[in-house]
């Protein structure tokens, strides 16, 4: 008797599977279409033997170009390592690698645009075209406005830390390539408030992604919805059929080990109950202000990303000084 396909194999027939990791070996093993990086993943990746040559090469560059401005050198080495990891990963996946713009630029439109252009140029210098990468930007109003301009320049963006309908719709209005609503962090907030859902269909993170997906499909929006930040395989299964799902290696492994039918939960033809209203800066701000969960999670997410970036820079500074 032929074994039934794993749930991961079935999921791949319904959604584009993205690996939420920079772990070279895990990506080789699990074969996602896309992968994503951030400063924490880059920092972890630098401990892996496969990146040893990259690390040594960029530290050597940093020591040779140190000069008097140590902070600028450290920041530049961090950028070079981030792009170096992305270049290596781009050779493993047939699709895209998401690369994160500095979180401490989240409220600065022009600085975000400048850093995104710099990253695209750095990738190009290393032989990776811009259609192989996504520039990951926090979904503040300023970040969305930066993405609007970058999209006009042909630089595709992944707007992350999406917790609220106003954020999602503003991204669609800006013709952003892709958004990443954070399923697990939404659930975390409500569980911490003592509001544990009775079923997966009442999970607030799952409900939010379904609502956004339906709104985009009903609107005819080309913006890709990529569910992110999963806490369980049940959340992933509840969103089977979503455009893309970015999943950590441990949950990918669990899905690969599980069998049984995985039904489609989302499809463009079944999109319903989604009303579209235009979003400007005022309605964006009021939409966030009326949503304590989104306000808290967006701010804490940016803070966490910024701390992760500073931790990466500190690691580099220590290695340069060693």
Curated annotation (Swiss-Prot):
Enzyme Commission (EC) number: 2.2.1.2
CC per GO annotation: cytosol
Location of the active site: 136 (schiff-base intermediate with substrate)
Cytoplasm is among the record's keywords: yes
Name of the top EC class for this enzyme: transferase
UniProt function note: Transaldolase is important for the balance of metabolites in the pentose-phosphate pathway.
Record GO biological process: carbohydrate metabolic process; pentose-phosphate shunt
Catalytic activity: D-sedoheptulose 7-phosphate + D-glyceraldehyde 3-phosphate = D-erythrose 4-phosphate + beta-D-fructose 6-phosphate
Lineage: Bacteria, Pseudomonadati, Pseudomonadota, Gammaproteobacteria, Lysobacterales
Protein name per UniProt: Transaldolase
Transmembrane regions listed in the UniProt entry: none
Pathway(s) it belongs to: Carbohydrate degradation; pentose phosphate pathway; D-glyceraldehyde 3-phosphate and beta-D-fructose 6-phosphate from D-ribose 5-phosphate and D-xylulose 5-phosphate (non-oxidative stage): step 2/3
Location of the protein in the cell: Cytoplasm
């Amino acid at each position: 008797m032929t074994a039934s396909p794993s749930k991961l194999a079935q999921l791949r027939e319904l959604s584009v599977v993205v690996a939420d990791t920079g772990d070279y070996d895990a990506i080789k093993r699990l074969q996602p279409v896309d992968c994503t990086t951030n400063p924490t993943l880059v920092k972890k990746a630098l401990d892996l033997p496969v990146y040893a040559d990259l690390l040594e090469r960029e530290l050597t560059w940093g020591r040779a170009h140190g000069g008097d401005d140590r902070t600028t050198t450290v920041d530049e080495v961090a950028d070079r390592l981030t792009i170096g990891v992305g270049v290596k990963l781009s050779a493993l996946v047939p699709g895209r690698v998401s690369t994160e713009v500095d979180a401490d630029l989240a409220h600065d439109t022009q600085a975000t645009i400048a850093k995104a252009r710099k990253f695209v140029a750095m990738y190009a210098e290393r032989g990776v075209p811009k259609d192989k990468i996504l520039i990951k930007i926090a979904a503040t109003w300023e970040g969305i406005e930066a993405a609007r301009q970058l999209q006009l320049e042909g630089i595709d963006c992944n707007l992350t830390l999406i917790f609220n309908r106003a954020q999602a719709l503003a991204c669609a209005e800006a013709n952003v390539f892709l958004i990443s609503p954070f399923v697990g962090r939404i659930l975390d907030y409500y569980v911490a408030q003592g509001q544990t859902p009775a079923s997966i269909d009442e999970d607030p993170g799952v409900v939010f992604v379904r609502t956004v997906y339906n709104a985009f499909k009903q609107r005819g929006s080309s913006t890709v919805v990529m569910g992110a930040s999963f806490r369980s395989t049940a959340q992933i299964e509840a969103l089977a059929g979503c455009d893309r799902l970015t999943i950590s290696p441990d949950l990918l492994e669990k899905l690969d080990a599980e069998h049984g039918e995985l039904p489609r939960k989302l499809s463009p033809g079944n999109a319903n109950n989604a009303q579209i209203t235009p979003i400007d800066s005022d309605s964006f701000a009021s939409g966030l202000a009326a949503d304590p969960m989104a306000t808290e999670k967006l701010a804490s997410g940016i803070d966490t990303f910024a701390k992760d970036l500073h931790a990466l820079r500190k690691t580099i500074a220590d290695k340069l000084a060693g």
